[in-house]
Amino acid sequence: ADRAAVDAALTRVGIDRLRGRDARELSLGERQLVLVALAVAQAAPLLVLDEPTVHLDLRHQVAVMELLADLNEHDGTTVLAVLHDLSLARHFFPRLAVLDGGRIVADGPPGRVLTRERVRAVFGVDVALTGAPSGG
């Protein structure tokens, strides 16, 4: 990506203040935000991210997820993100795929995919996810 695209991505991610800083001076969370900005700067039609919210506090987790949702909704970017935080996934993405042993065992709207039974079967924990999921 060229400098203008990187600058625009830093602004979009909300980390203009980090421009020009040495990566060794950044916290893990700041480094993660820079990586997200660099991915966004590519302006690719498909964005593949592995744990884009790792090392981030709640405010920045939400900001990154809102950015990804905005990229999908307004820029037409397809976002494929690996997330282990089921609450974030079900709140921000209208379609989820649940993998078990590397295979897709469920695919669809969060409310249909992340049932208590499926979470128990796949993740081995008995929890009920509450709140209205994205996309029903």
Residue map of PLM features:
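Catalytic Walker B motif of ABC-type/P-loop ATPase nucleotide-binding domains
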Residues: 47-51
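ABC ATPase "signature
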Residues: 107-108
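ABC ATPase nucleotide-binding domains
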Residues: 115-136
